[in-house]
């Protein structure tokens, strides 16, 4: 089902409705009866004699058939009541939208502003505002209780065999509990090991957590460019990404209408939204990096914080002294934000204003509880440049900035590479933990080889699974279009599914106590030839069914005990089932014979036969 919103120049369309055999359910955490935490339950065929399989759900109201979706009004502002109850914030008029906020685009090409304007909210002096500050004060927020319920999949006690699953895994020092309590969430946030990206101006948000001791999360990038896309396409891509499992979405728009595009996305997003503010700041100075100023950047931070952006990528670790370290690289500086700041540093021959004004940036972000995503502006753009001096010099600076941000009451995660061959991945995780005090790591892949343009979702998915296993908390997806063009709707889905696989593989390897439940359910369905259950339990039910039906399209084939790979005579699972049936039949026959013979364990005739056989084999000694 699609929802349309008329526009003066285009129709805004998003996909709604449940996935196959799926039902949206809600549970409430104990002690917080007003909270409704969403999950998806996948119904199985009655022959399975199993309950529905419950899975984590990022799709928001868009897959709830009872929800009334109105893109013109945005999603319900559920967290507003939580914020009011906590106190410590105020509504205020906010800044006016300026022509430069949308790239000085003329009226003809200006995207329509979001129809509803809500007053922005900011923190009051002397009160905790950020989730980090509440956690440090020993306060369990509604967001923390919501997250505990979400990470536990609504269970009220540890999953069966939880301790065994944890013991089987290799978590490389992570501390994954059998059961997550709100107090555990609070403790992880207070220690800086996890963040809850949740701007107080994004009340439509369904809270989630990013941290090494929780489920591995994934981020999907969307956004227009100077040559492609529109508001409608980007809102559609956001809804499409979360339908398939994106936990977070970054709006990396660099073209016209940046402000209005972002407003439409945030107001209709149930997941955290991140941005790179330097992109919009650059648009405000006509794309000339040397003309950037602290004042322009500061204004951009406030603009985006008032809109509700949940985390900012800020490349404050790109220092003047580090830029020459990239001179001998094969691919130089590949981060857009990093290259912008490097050019500014060289043009002015001084430290970046992101570095020199970092404490002021912290003060702004704390007022709105915008989380830091400290950008790796000097990440390697080829495996030849992996783990070089420039990359790790910046990482050490990010560790120093993390301590400053924590002291200011802000939440922090650290961005990582990039392009790294498999044998060089683990040292990245180890160094990040060492230098950044355990703050969550968030990596782009990494891509493990450079020879596969068009398939970089695969080259990076390999690295993502590995670094997720080693302790990376969030994986930024890579699509097949990486290095080639702006991703479209199909690319977004391909990237999200690839990274859901990587994140889930990491959860399994770490020994997450409930990660294997879905795998086991699908394996049972596969062995029992419950084809529809196999499709429905898959990350992409549509593709699974499509591939099956290309060669066996009839409904009768949905109950067949074979697929087109092996056919009816060579299906290993069918043969195995026949062997089992034969063995069970044979055991039943033997049991019947035993009972018919009187139930004696030793029979005289049999005993005599055994002795005769033993004599033939080796005389009386064999007896």
UniProtKB/Swiss-Prot annotation:
What cofactor is this protein dependent on?
[4Fe-4S] cluster
Q: Which Enzyme Commission number(s) are on file for it? A: 4.1.99.17
Disulfide links within the chain: none
Q: Keywords for this entry?
A: 4Fe-4S, Iron, Iron-sulfur, Lyase, Metal-binding, S-adenosyl-L-methionine, Thiamine biosynthesis, Zinc
Write out the GO biological process terms: thiamine biosynthetic process; thiamine diphosphate biosynthetic process
**Chain residues that bind substrate:** 221, 250, 279, 315, 335-337, 376-379, 415, 442
Its recorded reaction(s) are: 5-amino-1-(5-phospho-beta-D-ribosyl)imidazole + S-adenosyl-L-methionine = 4-amino-2-methyl-5-(phosphooxymethyl)pyrimidine + CO + 5'-deoxyadenosine + formate + L-methionine + 3 H(+)
Please give an example of a GO cellular component term from this record.
cytosol
What's the domain of life for this entry? Bacteria
For this protein, what does the record note about how its cofactor is bound? Binds 1 [4Fe-4S] cluster per subunit. The cluster is coordinated with 3 cysteines and an exchangeable S-adenosyl-L-methionine.
Q: In which pathway does it act?
A: Cofactor biosynthesis; thiamine diphosphate biosynthesis
**Which residues are Zn(2+)-binding?**
419, 483
Q: Where does [4Fe-4S] cluster bind?
A: 563, 566, 571
Q: Which Pfam families match?
A: ThiC-associated, ThiC_Rad_SAM
Q: Name one GO molecular function term.
A: 4 iron, 4 sulfur cluster binding
As for what it does, the entry says: Catalyzes the synthesis of the hydroxymethylpyrimidine phosphate (HMP-P) moiety of thiamine from aminoimidazole ribotide (AIR) in a radical S-adenosyl-L-methionine (SAM)-dependent reaction.
The record describes its quaternary structure and partners as:
Homodimer.
The UniProt entry's sequence similarity note says: Belongs to the ThiC family.
The entry's protein name is: Phosphomethylpyrimidine synthase
Query: What is the species listed in this Swiss-Prot or TrEMBL entry?
Result: Parvibaculum lavamentivorans (strain DS-1 / DSM 13023 / NCIMB 13966)
Q: Taxonomy-wise, where does this protein's organism fall, top ranks first?
A: Bacteria, Pseudomonadati, Pseudomonadota, Alphaproteobacteria, Hyphomicrobiales
């Amino acid at each position: 089902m699609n929802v349309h919103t008329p526009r003066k120049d285009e129709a805004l369309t998003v996909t709604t409705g449940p996935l196959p055999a799926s039902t949206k359910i809600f549970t409430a955490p104990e002690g917080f009866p007003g909270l409704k935490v969403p999950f998806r339950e996948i119904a199985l065929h009655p022959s399975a004699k199993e309950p529905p399989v419950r899975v984590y759900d990022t799709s928001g109201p868009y897959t709830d058939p009872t929800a009334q979706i109105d893109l013109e009004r945005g999603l319900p502002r559920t967290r507003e009541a939580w914020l009011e109850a906590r106190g410590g914030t105020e509504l205020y008029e906010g800044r006016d939208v300026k022509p430069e906020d949308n790239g000085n685009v003329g009226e003809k090409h200006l995207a329509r502003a979001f129809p509803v304007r809500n007053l922005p909210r900011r923190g009051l002096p002397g009160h905790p505002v950020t989730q980090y500050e509440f956690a440090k004060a020993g306060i369990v927020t509604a967001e923390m209780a919501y997250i505990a319920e979400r990470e536990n999949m609504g269970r009220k006690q540890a999953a069966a065999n939880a301790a065994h699953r944890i013991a089987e895994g290799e978590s490389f020092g992570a501390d994954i509990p059998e059961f997550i309590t709100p107090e555990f969430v609070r403790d992880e946030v207070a220690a800086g090991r996890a963040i809850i990206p949740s701007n107080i101006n994004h009340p439509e948000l369904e809270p989630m957590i990013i941290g090494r001791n929780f489920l591995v999360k994934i981020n999907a990038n969307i956004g227009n460019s100077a040559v492609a896309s529109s508001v409608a396409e980007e809102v559609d891509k956001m809804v499409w990404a979360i339908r398939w499992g994106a936990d977070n979405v970054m709006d990396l728009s660099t073209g016209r209408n940046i402000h209005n595009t972002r407003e439409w996305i945030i107001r209709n997003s149930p997941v955290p939204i991140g941005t790179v503010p330097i992109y919009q700041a650059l648009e405000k100075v006509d794309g000339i990096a040397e003309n950037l100023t602290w004042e322009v950047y500061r204004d951009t931070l406030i603009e985006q914080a008032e809109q509700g952006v949940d985390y900012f990528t800020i490349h404050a670790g790109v220092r003047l002294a580090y830029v020459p370290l990239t001179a001998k690289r094969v691919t130089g500086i590949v981060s857009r934000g990093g290259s912008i700041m490097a050019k500014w540093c060289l043009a002015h021959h001084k430290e970046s204003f992101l570095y020199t004004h970092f404490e002021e940036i912290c003060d702004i972000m704390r007022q709105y509880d915008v989380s830091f995503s400290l950008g790796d502006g000097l990440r390697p753009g080829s495996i030849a440049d992996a783990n070089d001096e420039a990359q790790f010099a910046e990482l050490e600076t990010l560790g120093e900035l993390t301590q400053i941000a924590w002291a200011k009451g802000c939440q922090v995660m650290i961005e990582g590479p990039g392009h790294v061959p498999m044998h060089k991945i683990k040292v990245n995780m180890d160094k990040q933990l060492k230098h950044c005090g355990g703050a969550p790591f968030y990596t782009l892949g990494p891509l493990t080889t450079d020879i596969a343009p068009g398939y970089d979702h695969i080259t990076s998915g390999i690295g993502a699974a590995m670094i997720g296993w080693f302790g990376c908390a969030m994986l930024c997806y890579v699509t097949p279009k990486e290095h080639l063009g702006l991703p479209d709707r199909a690319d977004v889905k391909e990237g999200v599914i690839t990274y859901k696989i990587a994140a889930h593989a990491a959860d399994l390897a770490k020994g997450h106590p409930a990660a294997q439940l879905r795998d086991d359910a699908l394996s049972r369905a596969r062995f029992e030839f419950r084809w529809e259950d196999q499709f429905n339990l898959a990350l992409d039910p549509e593709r699974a069914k499509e591939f099956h039906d290309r060669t066996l399209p009839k409904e009768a084939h949905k109950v067949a005990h074979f697929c087109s790979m092996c056919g009816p005579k060579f299906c290993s699972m069918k043969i195995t089932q026949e062997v089992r049936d034969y063995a069970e039949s044979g055991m039943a026959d033997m049991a019947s014979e035993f009972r018919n013979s009187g139930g004696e364990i030793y029979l005289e005739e049999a005993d005599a036969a055994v002795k005769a056989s033993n004599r033939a084999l080796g005389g009386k000694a064999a007896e």
